[in-house]
């Protein structure tokens, strides 16, 4: 288990991370962590590793791009003084290019995405024990689908930055691809973006695997 006793884990991202979390701080009980993968991760950490007392904060904001993360990074990440930061961003960076094709000011193209994400990781790396980079995803099994193809490019950037900075890497697209061998995309997300309960569990499982969570741990 890579996250240690009493350490603080902060999640940041878009609506997939947000999932109705409390404002201003997504921390605590009674739905404060939202209803998505963050809540599932916390539930399993508390159930299986209660002695670690890992503190979790959700700072996801629906609709965000990496550009938005940069604007709020100091307040929502650095000032929180986390031990670990998990970043999953990029879906809206890509999606706006397809659902709002003529509003180019909302598009975050690959070069800006890469430069901004790398800058945030490099700025934060010396201040924390570890960074976990999760790829954006598109719940579509056809790799030739235009938006899926673009999303894969952004995912490759995340992998490259993770390798460059020795960050943990969670390939969420690969996790979905495995389940898509059996299930139709609509079973996991009506719009191929916002996951169902099963979709969020896929994300949680992929995340937990990367941090060394032991599913068969006996206590």
Swiss-Prot record:
Q: Which reaction does it catalyse?
A: Deacetylation of xylans and xylo-oligosaccharides
**InterPro entries per UniProt:** Ester_Hydrolysis_Enzymes, SGNH_hydro, SGNH_hydro_sf
Biological pathway: Glycan degradation; xylan degradation
In its UniProt entry, what is this protein called? Acetylxylan esterase
Q: Tell me, in one coarse class, where this protein mainly resides.
A: cytoplasm
Query: What Pfam families does this protein's entry cite?
Result: Lipase_GDSL_2
Taxonomy, superkingdom: Bacteria
């Amino acid at each position: 288990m890579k996250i240690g006793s009493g350490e603080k884990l902060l999640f940041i991202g878009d609506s997939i991370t947000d999932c109705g979390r409390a404002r201003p701080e997504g921390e605590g009980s009674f739905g404060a962590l939202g209803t998505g993968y963050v809540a599932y991760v916390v539930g399993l950490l508390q159930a299986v590793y209660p002695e670690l007392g890992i503190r979790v904060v959700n700072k996801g904001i629906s609709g965000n791009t990496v550009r938005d993360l940069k604007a709020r990074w100091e307040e929502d990440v650095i000032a929180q003084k986390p031990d670990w930061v998990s970043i999953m961003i990029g879906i809206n960076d890509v999606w706006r290019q397809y659902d709002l094709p003529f509003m180019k000011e909302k598009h975050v193209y690959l070069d800006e995405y890469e430069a901004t994400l790398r800058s945030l990781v490099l700025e934060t790396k010396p201040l924390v024990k570890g960074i976990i980079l999760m790829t954006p995803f598109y719940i579509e099994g056809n790799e030739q689908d235009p938006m899926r193809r673009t999303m894969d490019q952004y995912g490759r950037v995340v992998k490259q930055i993770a390798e460059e900075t020795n960050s943990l890497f969670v390939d969420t697209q690969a996790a979905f691809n495995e389940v898509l061998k059996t299930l139709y995309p609509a079973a996991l997300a009506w719009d191929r973006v916002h996951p169902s309960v099963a979709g969020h569990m896929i994300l949680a499982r992929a995340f937990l695997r990367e941090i060394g969570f032991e599913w068969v741990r006996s206590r």
